[in-house]
Amino acid sequence: MANTLFDRTIAFAGICQAASLVQKMAKDGHCDQEAFDTAIQSILETNPSNTVAVYGKESNLRIGLECLVRDFDNTPSGSELTRYLISLMALERKLAGHRDGMSKLGERIGTIERQLEHFDIHDEQMLSNIASIYLDVISPMGPRIQVTGTPSVLQQPMTQHKVRALLLSGIRSAVLWRQVGGKRRHLIFGRKKMVEQAKIILARI
């Protein structure tokens, strides 16, 4: 895959979208269904032809692109999103240096793909299986991501499955970010360029 500003912007928008959906799901118990489906589908796209193919099409990343453009302010909501982003990228770095973890992740995703021949991806059992990949493979690498939200919402098993599945999709996008050459310096010094690129994409979708 190409290491261009466009590719980095798409991948980073994927991480932003996952973080934004986690925040919404944890507070309200629901989020944009199309964006959620895009996130889950991205986990299964293990051999994409290009960066956009991970998400299907550019318009499937509208929430993430808007989140990227809006920037993260110092409000509690903005600080929370920033924390999720930093945590996801830190976990991906641990995963990248853990060959066994990457191998296990690939095996577990392969199992999900086989199960999808018989079950719908929206079934509670399937979402539970996807969530368990995050719990079993990613979470033990630490540091643990503390998800904050509405306690009564977060206590519901289905919400927990969806939040963990979304966190796994965030890791998927962070892996993609690294694959297309994304580095910390791009976030510090190249953020303005990514915002401009995101605006261009948003204008055409």
Swiss-Prot record:
It is found in: Cytoplasm; Cell inner membrane. It is a peripheral membrane protein. It comes from the Bacteria. The keyword Membrane applies. Pfam families: DUF489. HAMAP family: HflD_protein. This is High frequency lysogenization protein HflD homolog. It comes from Aliivibrio fischeri (strain MJ11) (Vibrio fischeri). The lineage of its organism: Bacteria, Pseudomonadati, Pseudomonadota, Gammaproteobacteria, Vibrionales.
